[in-house]
Amino acid sequence: MSLIIDSHAHVVVPPESYKFMAELAANRANPSLGVPKLSDETVRKAGQSIIDIMDKVGTDIQFLSPRPYMQMHSVKPGKVTALWTKHMNDLVYQTVQMFPTRFRAVAGLPQYRDTCPSNTLAELEFRVKEQGFIGCLLNPDPTEGDSLPPPGLGDPFWYPLYEKLCELDIPALIHSAGSCSPRESYTLKFINEESIAIISLLESEVFKRFPTLKLIVPH
């Protein structure tokens, strides 16, 4: 019997996480109070709400990741992004641990504006090697339209991340985050950034240099 797997799904964010998000945005992680631990009851309620829908439509397994438009990749300073990413990855991990037969974990990366993606590798490696995550999200424009974006995904700028993805033998799901542009909603940016990413990759030598690289384009 074959399984129906949803490879592109996101966690339900509980009220406690929204509170933490508001505090981070307000105090800019200065001072930092660390990352809150969500109760099992909170995580169970959020996870069960997803499973109820999965059961209705006949989905066996979902690959869960943080909600992309809430990743705060452009919010200054970078510590805000780092703490929020950790909190969301913790939520993903807790949810998968609670419902191991229904979910698999996909990590968010602490990408920050136009910073080299090598700053994301420690978080990615920890989640994969220590917690069994099976992939990650990759945002082509962590500036979220607020300033000049990094080069396209075909550029060597991204090679440190591609090397790590190949080393860990996991795929990345290409997914932009929010949008600061008044002429481009975050949902429109999802489509635009993936279109740009595809052309940039096709016109590059990325897959010659990294023949085992696995990328997913979901929209």
What are these regions (language model features)?
Residues 1-219:
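Helix-coil boundary/capping segments in enzymes
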